[in-house]
Amino acid sequence: MYKIGIILGTRPEIIKMSPVIRELTTKKFFLIHTNQHYSENMDKIFFEELNLKKPDYNLNIGSGSHGDQTGRMLMEIEKVLLKEKPDFVLVQGDTNTVLAGALAASKLGIKIGHIEAGLRSFDRKMPEETNRVLTDHISEFLFAPTKTAANNILKEGISDEKIHIVGNTIVDATIQNLKIAEKNEKVCKFISKITKNEKYFLLTLHRAENTDNFEILSKLVTSINNISKKYEKNIIFPIHPRTHKKLNEFGLINKLENNHLIKIIEPVGYLEFLGLEKNAELIITDSGGLQEEACILNVPCVTLRENTERPETLDVNSNILAGSDPENILNCVEKMLKSNRHWNNPFGDGNSGKIIVNIVFGEKKP
């Protein structure tokens, strides 16, 4: 029987791979978790929350420089693949786990399927862009979420025969996991307690290009304060550890903490966060995944970046690129709050997981 290996290492990958894992329950497959960001114990709860099969292999790689982390992953993944001998390996996204998994499989002559293939920011300074491009070029099956992504791959000289436009599994995941969240009493109580059932904006900030540069981070802090004062709305800010560290280092944290409208909270679980997204009036972020989820949930999004690998969100007007200039950010917030919230979702109908599994086992286009 055809045997599949799934390789993942971060929570966004677990989320986006969850529909595929659910579709594989009647098939022969195993799950490798590199633990790129979190410990085995922390992610154990995450798998349980989403009612997913626990990983067969936890590699406990942890953090490190890009070369160190990718190299250790490559060695450990290779050991598992030699033992399991899968016919096919699936990876999702653009992390070091994805590149290491694809390289390990490629060196062993194992077929690779890249889910979310073809995304391009066209910014080679981003480590994720390198991972995306390299993984696409060594994969046999490229599961592109949209026609735009497929065209990016074609322009790089990859054969049309390898490309399958399947939609984005984030649609499946958001629909499936939102149902779990809405039935979870603990999650519902948390949302009510944090929001006090009032309207609010949701903020996330974690990208190195924003957090590691004092000038840019200072502008963003000014912008956040300006937004809260202009609209007199609570801004709920689940703060990323690296962002918290940098705000402290640069002496900027007090500028946020002294504003009673900015609610800085610890990072929250995925189901809780999904609830916060769904009920927000506006999402302000530098996250790629949140641009997609906001679009799916019909919540306007302001992206604190100069570029995006999700141009489809710009095309349907669910998202706008604001950069880091305070005046421009304020203008973008105003524009999105006035926008029509009923756009067409460009990422598919929520059946991407099923389509991908059918292609893997039938090796045919949908």
UniProtKB/Swiss-Prot annotation:
The record's InterPro entries line, in alphabetical order, gives: UDP_GlcNAc_Epimerase_2_dom, WecB-like
pH dependence (UniProt free text):
Active from pH 6 to 10.
Which SUPFAM superfamilies does this entry report, sorted A to Z?
UDP-Glycosyltransferase/glycogen phosphorylase
Give the enzyme's EC designation: 5.1.3.14
| GO cellular component: a single term | cytoplasm
Specify the superkingdom: Archaea
Principal subcellular localization: cytoplasm
Keyword hit for Isomerase:
yes
Write out the entry's keywords from A to Z. Answer: Cytoplasm, Isomerase
Could you give the subunit structure recorded for this chain?
A: Homodimer.
> Any idea what this protein is called?
UDP-N-acetylglucosamine 2-epimerase
Provenance organism:
Methanococcus maripaludis (strain DSM 14266 / JCM 13030 / NBRC 101832 / S2 / LL)
